[in-house]
A protein has these predicted regions:
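Contiguous mid-protein beta-loop-alpha structural module that forms a pocket-lining wall or clamp
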Residues: 296, 311-313
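Conserved SAM/AdoMet-binding glycine-rich loop
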Residues: 73, 81-82, 86, 178-298
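Proteins enriched for Cys/Gly/acidic motifs involved in redox and nucleic-acid/cofactor modification
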Residues: 1-193, 231-234, 245, 267-278, ...
Length: 350
């Protein structure tokens, strides 16, 4: 029995795929490289933008067309926000909410009742990651977010923060390293908020990873800039911690950041970047910017353009704002026209 696992969107979705790969193997599945080869398809969807939601629906239909005989399980943020719509799409056999992701394999066994051989589907020592030709592993360190940025639907889809224990994470990392993994990416919805619910912190987690594992290369997924304390960059004295962080600013205008309910001012962000570059040689900062947020004036956009040039990011992920039903931003007045958003995006891409 073969299962094809596919993720859209963030690195956290990819990390969850890796966990399911291991769990499916333990109950007798082997991993299919393509949906056409699979008896079961599991899709981890995204809903961060309206385009991501559209792509999630499109992918479900494409997978069903490519293999109409396969059973299909759909989970992830879009599945949590719009389960009724997914259930009406031909080919979808089971929709699993984000809150049930940890027991997804059990739900598949219980609801779909697909018979499999009760044995491992790979040779001893072969991991699910290598079956998927991967040498980098994404580690899910936490889920959920306690903040509510006005444009963000992910916090609605993912719920409250829940961190894994340091010991649990260390065990997983050491196991992956023993299997040959050379690089890990610490991922989550609110990576910088790790430990808020278990009296710990991201700093403590990284300290433990550096001290208790021999993983050669360690990276972070996106981290909110306000979560990093003054001593955080001291950790990069260890060369195993790669000198790069993705710190989303979203706008270079403080007035826009306030409407977004972001917890960082542009001045503070610039100081943080300067601190990182001062303490860590060759430190690379990448970021996210949203163009066309409701009410964004020409002056505010020009402030963003100037700020980007001032900070000098290594790379910028540019997102064109779109309303997401259920967010505060969707109810804000003074929406920006498609033409203006397109032009602002073009200018940022230059």
């Amino acid at each position: 029995m073969q299962v094809h696992l596919s993720a859209l969107g963030c690195r956290l979705n990819e990390a969850e795929l890796q966990n399911w790969a291991t769990s499916f193997q333990k109950v007798g599945y082997s991993l299919a490289a393509t949906p056409e080869m699979a008896d079961l398809i599991v899709l981890n969807t995204c809903a961060v933008t309206s385009e991501a939601a559209r792509k999630s629906r499109q992918t479900v239909r494409r997978f069903h067309r490519s293999n109409p005989e396969a059973r299909m399980v759909v989970t992830g943020c879009y599945a949590s926000l719009e389960p009724q719509k997914l259930e009406q799409i031909m080919g979808v056999d089971l929709v699993v909410d984000n809150s049930d992701k940890d027991v997804l394999v059990d739900k598949v066994k219980e609801v779909l009742d697909i018979p499999v051989m009760p044995e491992f589907a790979t040779e001893p020592g072969e991991s699910a990651l290598f079956a998927r030709n991967r040498e980098r592993a994404f580690i899910k360190i936490q889920d959920g977010c306690r903040y509510r940025c006005t444009y963000c639907i992910v916090t609605v889809a993912r719920g409250e923060e829940k961190s894994r224990t340091i010991d649990d994470l260390i065990d997983e990392i050491n196991k992956l390293h023993a299997e040959g993994i050379q690089e890990i990416v610490l991922a989550g919805v609110h990576v910088g908020g790790y430990g808020s619910d278990i009296d710990s912190s991201l700093y403590q987690l990284v300290e433990n990873v550096l001290e208790r594992t021999e993983m050669p290369r360690i990276r972070f997924a996106s981290v909110e800039p306000w979560d990093l304390g003054e001593n955080f960059f001291e950790l990069f004295a260890n060369p195993r911690l790669m000198a790069h962080m993705h710190l989303p600013i979203q706008s270079g205008a403080d007035s826009v950041l306030r409407r977004m309910s972001r917890r960082c001012r542009t001045e503070d962000f610039a100081e943080l970047v300067n601190q990182a570059r001062t303490q860590v040689a060759g430190f690379n900062v990448t970021t996210d910017v949203i163009v066309g947020f409701p009410g964004e004036t020409d002056e505010e956009f020009e402030q963003t353009m100037q700020y980007i040039e001032q900070v000098g990011f290594g790379h910028i992920h540019i997102f064109t704002y779109s309303d997401r039903e259920g967010t505060k931003a969707a109810r804000l007045p003074n929406k920006i026209s498609k033409e203006v958003k397109k032009e602002r995006s073009r200018r940022l891409h230059e």
